[in-house]
Swiss-Prot record:
Entry's Gene Ontology cellular component terms: cytoplasm
Organism listed in the record: Synechocystis sp. (strain ATCC 27184 / PCC 6803 / Kazusa)
Full protein name: Transcription-repair-coupling factor
SUPFAM superfamilies xrefs: CarD-like (SSF141259), P-loop containing nucleoside triphosphate hydrolases (SSF52540), TRCF domain-like (SSF143517)
Positions occupied by motif DEEQ box: 775-778
Protein family: In the N-terminal section; belongs to the UvrB family. In the C-terminal section; belongs to the helicase family. RecG subfamily.
Function: Couples transcription and DNA repair by recognizing RNA polymerase (RNAP) stalled at DNA lesions. Mediates ATP-dependent release of RNAP and its truncated transcript from the DNA, and recruitment of nucleotide excision repair machinery to the damaged site.
Designated gene of the protein: mfd
Length: 1199
């Protein structure tokens, strides 16, 4: 599910184009949520006016220290924010754990700070030889980048764990030397920039897609700073930096102009290594492993920080002095720190390097720094009655879901909330995701309460306060809020937890803000020498190389009987041969009979499929179903209470579903998206509409018990504020429970039932079933599928699947099979930290222990069942405290399901299994996966396995273990090195999902069609299916596979314009695979933006492509010169079709075109120069387009 990007500072909303200050130009670390950062601003204003707040301010300024106790988390944030903001100071909050820091950050974002930054730290030992995870380092750089420039930072809040107080950074002055400030208009040799970028650790490539990369094309340099949200494009005029612009990493298009930016190093190693070299320190004497260094480069130089610098720094060294520091729960911070200190001290001793400077300090020494250098506040939830501490004595509000009469009496002061405590004279605030409903429910019981939509409408809020009217504010964020009473401040706050019993739907976790090229559509047809390709006329061949001949470039394709040269501008007649088999395909002979026979056989099968699909669509169009009314206010309220920002894909899927429900024929829609991409929320909204707007019953069907449990809990939580009843039907229900559920379904007392295939049993009778939601239909058996098929004619059906469905298939079937695709990944998905290691029991023990220490669970995956029980025994010896479960495909289904459910419920810590890990299962606590013998798995398999972790926003780890390096082949070694570089949601991930898409086609279209697809390759099959559907729908212009242009033209991409071969191939692919000629100006703009002004051969290439596109759409297969005077258009079209086209030409031109069988002669055009011939044909073909059916016109020429 995609979380929103909260706009947390003015600089993000109205960005100041003239300021170089990093605060305005670079975005910093944030946990995003669908919230108004000013939600609590009116409560903060109110707190600041109270006498007790004034006393606390004076005490803090006079003594430099305030100690508060008796405070839960939310009032802690409110009180310290009001104090720091009234003193016009920044805020640093130190917590004991990462989880607590995440919660603090989510709450501070509601409290009016200009920026709220989470400063990420590692729980690992500073002496760990592994490299620090990039995401964490970049997150630190984002926070440090602003602080290091010495600008007057105002309105800034930073949250970190006590690890941020440990020495883990280079000195401030040293790091500042490694930061490069760039300004528009400054003189700088672009060559010296290259040297600086290398010094800062930036890697040069052909395209910039992710942090730490840079590329150069002439006078244009692209860089993705690790401390920024977007990459930047620098343009030079001579030695002057003329332009600085952000650009979108997905489209590579330029965006906003900037006046300046600051580049930080990509990691701290870039700062540490030169310091070590300057002192001529030989790292081999300090435990650096030569073999590891040879394979992966120098790793983890942070453990030598003390050798490089006599005084390593911590976060406090970088803070402005105008900062109030808050130590939250000092006892817990101390305990957590001391446990870490003891473990790390043992690691340091085990190194047996007594002269290696220590990078661990005990907590009391760290606390002294806080007390001497800053004003600081300590906070404790436990009531303390000592002289130094002020006990705020906060009280919780008892949870009383749906007891509005009782709550109204309490808020009016007519009933005691605790013995001797009434709230009649208290300032009362209600924070709710359903504010209008909350207000109306309380007003029914004579409670004075008002909803104020704008939390900064201070006059209206103050007026309500004077009139003793409770103020209700809207909130739908991620922070878990609990109501409280502050007797010392005479303030009470009530949340949805007390009103409806509704808990937060998710725990906020740290996510570094950035926009990466995750949405970038990877060019699946990107060809490399050695790839197998399919040519539409000749079949399967092997791509050898790109070759220049005369004025054009050609792809050399190896066939069984020789080499075929394909012009680069005809690249659309080729596609990569993609199939699911592992054996290389046999090469065809050029123009051979075998390929023609295969094509004809597949074409017949595809036509039959198209006819079947269209018949099914026609049948469904005649059925009549229940038409639901438009959305109710409750529907709007439920959707507003969703704590994440829905992605555009999600919103479109919801609109599609609602349109189906409000239509008068039964819905049968498929929603497709990976686990965690938000399919369930689409279903939640549909279910709610069916129950509340249509008074219908709903059944949600899932293939496994574990999934039913997850869906049941989601619905219970989302629908808590509403009078909706939900039942769960699976094999863990007792006979009496099942009997009660069945009776309530029959009588209509139960609105929703969630269950496995039992829901389809003959004993299940509904009073009025309106909607059936099916999760992963392809995983049900034949009998269940038949029952579902009969239900589909009677009720609305919504099917969810996590198997990717390719967009090409989606486009072909749109209008025939209702499908919605959710392809946008959630920004909260943190890239998984991948570790490569030779098999080592100590590495495994540490990885498991680290995960269990933070309350998580572990998948341990092996490639085979043999020896799995023994492995379980070995793990028990390594980690005696761990509870271990074992799961594999040869277990009884019920036993395997019980094991998975127990693991899901946290009854086991480690699941030792084969690759059967549940594809649709979402277990947020599993954040470490260990894969033994990683070299035995394919890349796509490893991606799928790795994708089982990292779902909750917590940093996940994947350990890929391989045998001793001497046993590895060179190929396996290279693959493992490449694996370490892959990012979970980057291009490699998309390539792996494309392999799964082929399975998705099989699931959707059946086994026979899968076989046809294997024969001719996936891409060509999809094209045939689209053509068959169009043909049956009545398009008369003949289809030609390619248009050959035999005119003496100079049309190609010169090597000095796009030097990189891979980029050049991608450029040819992009320009030749356009859907509409409208795309060409945009491509020309993009190329001009990225590579500079278009040279003449490239302009000619654009015209050739436009001509080909128009000619192909009109059914012309070849354009050639005939004699000295004429041009010939070869075509399979019949004369009536030609007459239809010719009618669209002006009268004076019609006589120049002469039709005869299989060709049209254009008289007199041959005497003109080739470029002029092309211009005339483009103009005339454009006129002929008017004869095409309107739908096809829109597809080809653009709407």
């Amino acid at each position: 599910m995609a979380e929103p990007r909260a706009v947390l500072k003015q600089g993000n909303r109205n960005r100041d184009k003239d300021s170089v200050g990093l605060g305005n130009r670079l975005r910093f670390v944030s946990i995003s949520s669908a919230l108004n950062p000013m939600t609590f601003s009116s409560i903060l204003r109110h707190l600041q006016t109270l006498p007790l707040s004034k006393d606390l301010r004076e005490k803090l300024q006079k003594r430099g220290h305030v100690q508060l106790s008796g405070l839960p988390r939310l009032p802690k944030g409110l009180i310290v924010s009001s104090l720091a903001q009234s003193l016009e100071k920044n805020l640093l909050v130190i917590t004991a754990t990462l989880e607590e820091a995440g919660r603090w950050t989510a709450q501070l974002e509601l409290m009016g700070w200009q920026t709220v930054n989470f400063y990420p730290t590692s729980e690992a030992s500073p002496y760990d030889p592994g490299r620090l995870e990039s995401e964490m380092v970049w997150g630190q750089m984002q926070v440090l980048a602003e602080l290091i420039q010495g600008h007057q930072v105002k309105g800034k809040a930073i949250v970190a764990t006590e690890k941020a107080l440990q020495p883990h950074l280079p000195p401030v002055a040293t790091l500042r030397e490694y930061c490069l400030a760039l300004r528009r208009g400054q003189e700088m040799d672009s060559k010296s920039l290259e040297l600086t970028l290398a010094r800062l650790g930036y890697e040069r490539g052909s395209t910039v897609e992710t942090e730490g990369q840079w590329s150069r094309r002439g006078d244009i340099v692209d860089i993705f700073p690790v401390s920024a949200e977007l990459p930047v494009r620098l343009e030079w005029f001579g030695d002057e930096l003329e332009k600085i612009r952000e650009f979108d990493p997905a489209s590579q298009r330029s965006l906003d102009d900037l006046t300046g930016l600051v580049l930080t190093p990509t990691s701290f190693d870039q700062v540490i290594e030169p310091a070590l070299n300057a002192q001529a320190i030989d790292l081999s004497a300090w435990g650096e492993d030569a073999e590891t260094e040879q394979l992966f480069g120098k790793e983890g130089l942070q453990r030598f920080l003390g050798l490089a610098f006599t005084e390593p720094a911590c976060l406090l060294d970088y803070l402005p002095t105008e900062t109030v520091c808050v130590l939250d729960e000092p006892e817990q911070c101390a305990a957590h720190s001391e446990r870490w200190f003891e473990a790390v001290a043992q690691d340091w001793s085990a190194l047996q390097l007594p002269n290696l400077p220590q990078l661990h300090r005990n907590f009391s020494a760290l606390g002294d720094r806080l007390k001497t250098d800053f004003q600081y506040i300590t906070l404790s939830e436990i009531h303390e009655a000592n002289g130094d501490s002020l006990d705020i004595s906060a009280r919780p509000i008892p949870t009383m879901p749906h007891q509005f009469a009782k709550l109204a009496e309490i808020l009016r002061g007519k009933r005691e909330i605790y013995s001797g405590l009434t709230l009649g004279q208290y300032s009362t605030w209600l924070i709710s995701a359903q504010p209008s409903r909350t207000v109306s429910l309380l007003q029914e019981h004579d409670c004075a309460v008002q909803f104020i939509a704008n939390p900064r409408d201070y006059p209206a809020i103050e007026k309500s306060q004077i009139q003793r009217t409770a103020v209700t504010l809207k909130y739908s964020g991620l922070a878990e809020l609990e109501g409280f009473i502050l007797p010392t401040f005479r303030l009470v706050l009530v949340t949805d937890r007390e009103l409806f019993g509704q808990h937060a739907l998710a725990t906020p976790e740290y996510v570094r803000k950035r926009r990466r090229a995750t949405s970038k559509q990877v060019d699946i047809n990107k060809l490399s020498p050695g790839d197998y390709v399919v040519h539409k006329s000749h079949g399967i061949g092997k791509f050898l190389k790109l070759d220049a001949l005369a004025n054009r470039e050609y792809l050399m394709i190896q066939y069984a009987d020789g080499i075929l040269r394909v012009p680069a501008d005809s690249l659309d007649s080729l596609s990569r041969f993609r199939h699911t088999g592992t054996r290389p395909p046999e090469l065809h002979k050029m123009g051979g009979k075998v390929w023609e026979a295969t094509k004809n056989k597949v074409r017949k099968a595809v036509k039959k499929l198209a006819v079947d699909l269209l018949n099914l669509y026609a049948k469904r169009a005649k059925q009549v179903g229940y038409a639901y009314p438009p959305d109710s206010p409750w529907q709007q309220e439920l959707e507003d209470s969703f704590p994440y920002q829905p992605t555009p894909d999600q919103l479109k899927a919801v609109q599609d579903v609602k349109r189906d429900l409000e239509g008068d024929r039964p819905m049968d829609r498929l929603v497709c998206g990976d686990v965690g991409f938000g399919k369930t929320e689409v279903a939640v909204r549909a279910i709610f509409k069916a129950v509340t707007s249509g008074n219908k019953q709903v059944a949600l069907l899932a293939p496994t018990t574990v999934l039913t449990q997850q869906h049941y809990h989601t619905l219970k939580e989302r629908f808590a504020p509403y009078p909706i009843t939900i039942g769960l039907l699976n094999r863990f229900r007792t006979a009496s429970e099942k009997k009660e559920i069945l009776a309530k379904l029959k009588s209509g007392e139960l609105d929703i039932v969630v269950g496995t295939q039992q829901v389809l049993g003959t004993s299940v009778k509904f009073k009025d079933l309106g909607l059936l939601v099916i999760d992963e239909e392809q995983r049900f058996g034949v009998n269940q599928k038949e029952k579902i098929k009969t239900l589909k004619t009677e009720v609305d059906v919504l099917t969810l699947t996590a198997t990717p469905i390719p967009r090409t298939l989606y486009m072909s079937l749109s209008g025939i099979r209702e499908m919605s695709l959710i392809t946008t990944p959630p920004p909260s998905r943190r890239p998984i930290k991948t570790h490569l290691s030779p098999y080592n029991p100590e590495v495994i023990r540490t990885a498991i222990r680290n995960e269990l220490d933070r309350g998580g669970q572990v998948f341990y995956v092996v490639p085979r069942i043999e020896g799995i029980e023994e492995l379980g025994g070995q793990l028990r010896q390594m980690v005696p405290s761990a509870r271990i479960a074992i799961g594999h495909g040869q277990m009884e289904e019920s036993e395997l399901e019980s094991t998975m459910l127990a693991f899901n419920d946290g009854e086991a810590d480690i699941l030792v299994c084969t690759t059967i890990i549940e594809a649709g299962l979402d277990i947020p606590r599993v954040n470490t996966i260990i894969v033994e013998d990683a070299q035995k798995f394919g890349l796509a398999q490893l991606y799928q396995l790795r994708g089982r972790v990292g779902r909750s926003g917590i940093q996940a780890h994947a350990w890929l273990l391989y045998p001793n390096q001497k046993q590895l082949t060179e190929k396996a070694r290279l693959r493992l090195r490449a694996l370490q570089e892959f990012s979970q949601l980057g291009s490699g991930y998309q390539l792996a999902t494309r392999d799964m898409e082929i399975r998705g086609v099989g699931n959707l279209l059946g086994a026979e069609q899968s076989g046809q697809m294997e024969a001719i390759g996936y891409e060509f099959y999809m094209e045939m299916l689209q053509d068959a559907i169009k043909e049956i729908q009545g398009q008369e212009i003949p289809k030609v596979e390619d248009t050959q242009i035999d005119l003496p033209l100079t049309a190609f991409i010169p090597s000095d314009y796009i030097p990189d071969l891979e980029e050049k191939m991608a450029a040819y692919r992009r320009i030749t695979s356009i859907e509409s000629t409208d795309e060409l100006p945009k491509i020309a703009l993009d190329w001009g933006d990225r590579y500079g002004m278009l040279p003449s051969p490239v302009e000619e290439l654009f015209k050739v492509v436009k001509l080909k596109h128009l000619a192909k759409s009109l059914g012309f297969s070849r354009i050639k010169v005939e004699g000295k005077q004429n041009l010939v258009l070869e075509t399979p079209m019949e004369e009536p079709a030609w007459k239809l086209l010719a009618e669209n030409l002006p009268n004076h031109l019609q006589s120049r075109f002469v039709y005869s069988a299989k060709k049209v002669v254009v008289r007199g055009l041959g005497v003109l120069a080739p470029a002029k011939q092309m211009d005339n044909l483009i103009d005339w073909f454009g006129k002929m387009q008017g004869a095409l059916p309107e739908t096809k016109m829109e597809t080809l020429v653009g709407k």
